[in-house]
Design a protein with these regions (language model features):
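Radical SAM enzyme [4Fe-4S]-AdoMet core and its adjacent flexible, acidic
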Residues: 1-115, 129-134
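Short Cys/His-rich metal-coordination motifs, predominantly Zn2+-binding knuckles/fingers
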Residues: 126
Length: 135
């Protein structure tokens, strides 16, 4: 388990000051604050939402490959940006993580990302995917 504070550049001065005070460090870039606690300061991107104006069918992503999210109700989602559980792969209270990650839907997403194909509708509307595919 770890904590990652995600902050946008320029708009979180008070939060950064509080974190600097708590962890007794100067925060001017993304960094480790202590064991399993990080701060990520970056340019703002549009949060995934099927109702936004972003629409891409191709691109790479680190979701499900490098990390997953587990919501409070036990829903396993492919990334930390799916806070509403739009892409529920399974439930950790009902199935093992291994079986969830080896489900047909999860494997289809992994294969799609390998081939730079976005399989899920939410992924097609993700501003973070736009951001990482610029690099």
């Amino acid at each position: 388990t770890y904590v990652n504070y995600r902050l946008w550049l320029g708009s979180n001065k008070k939060i950064i000051e509080k974190l600097e005070e708590k962890y007794n460090v100067k925060i001017d870039k993304s960094r480790k604050l202590e064991e399993n606690v990080f701060v990520d300061i970056d340019e703002e991107f549009e949060w995934p939402d099927v109702n936004n104006n972003i629409y891409k069918t191709s691109g790479k992503c680190y979701g499900i490959r490098d990390h997953v999210g587990i919501l409070v109700d036990g829903s396993v989602v492919p990334c930390c940006l799916d806070g509403n559980g739009s892409i529920k792969l399974g439930n950790i209270f009902e199935s093992s993580l291994d079986s969830i990650l080896n489900s047909k839907r999860a494997l289809k997403m992994v294969e799609g990302f390998k081939n730079k194909k976005l399989e899920e509708e939410l992924c097609k509307h993700c501003g973070f995917i736009e951001k990482i595919n610029k690099n």
